[in-house]
Amino acid sequence: MLGAHAADQMENFELRDRYLHEIEHLPQKQQLSRHLLLAESALSRRDYPTAAQNLEAAAKINSNLSRLVRLQLRYAFDHGDAADVLAKAEKLVKAGAINDYEAEQYQNWAYRRLLSEVTDAGSLKACLKRIPESLKSGELCVAIAEKCERLGLYAEAVKWVKAHYPQTRQPELLEAFVESVRFLSEREQQKAIDLADSWLQEQPDNAPLLMYLGQLAYGRKLWGKAQGYLEASIALQPSVSAHLVLARVFDETDQPQKAQEQRNLVLESVAEEEHPAALTQPN
């Protein structure tokens, strides 16, 4: 096997296969290393049928071997099998064969994958039960809010943001919040504006929050409030979104000149991004 390993490392597959052919005549229980080497080589070539065949044969000999489980993890990851990735990563953690950082990376990927496969309220509920609280309130917090909104679970999306935004203050949560609020009743929309306004009291210089409040007020046709929020947002941090919504506010209040001014500012900012000013050359 040492010769086969060395030949494989040198990518001398003819020599490797000659060594492996000799080992092939040994009893099945003595062929574990052969199956592992063939599986690893097949995975590197993305020859998944051969990899699966050898992984299965190796598992019949010793299913708990850490090297085998690592290869199974790699196979599951390549196939996008989130449930199997979680199972194999957990097995390696228990065996002390994988460090915390690597395990966390695999777990984060797997939970994101599971979340992406959710198609309705029932499967979302089942998925959320599997995800650790630390991830739900951390790295996956925004993705969960966005998933609720995309599934049309607007009340759930608003409830999620209400529960998590005060702690995380992730501006990305606000987009899912605003997009979902507009599908709720007028009473619920007003409650959402009041809620977001209460967040603003704690962080009055939060430009994204001001912009999204402006969008909420625009949706409720509260033109004066919308203008105030948007102008405050632009004063702190100009953005294309804030300028465009403010232009629509001016359209609704019969101020076409001011509306055009906002759109001109957008065009100027886009032009600057596409054609930044040339650096001044020294004389």
For each feature predicted by the language model, list its residue ranges:
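Generic helix N-cap/helix-start motif at coil->alpha-helix transitions
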Residues: 1-2, 27-36, 48-50, 62-70, ...
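Alpha-helical adaptor scaffolds
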Residues: 4-11, 21-24, 32, 36-40, ...
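Alpha-solenoid helical repeat scaffolds
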Residues: 21, 56, 87-90, 125-129, ...
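TPR/TPR-like (Sel1-like) alpha-helical repeat modules
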Residues: 60-61, 74-98, 158, 162-171, ...
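Structural motif corresponding to the intra-repeat A-B loop/turn of tetratricopeptide repeats
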Residues: 10-11, 45, 79, 117-118, ...
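Single-residue signature of alpha-solenoid repeat helices
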Residues: 16, 51, 85, 123-124, ...
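TPR/Sel1-like alpha-solenoid repeat signature
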Residues: 42, 148, 210-217, 229, ...
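Conserved structural position within tetratricopeptide repeats
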Residues: 25, 57-60, 94, 129-133, ...
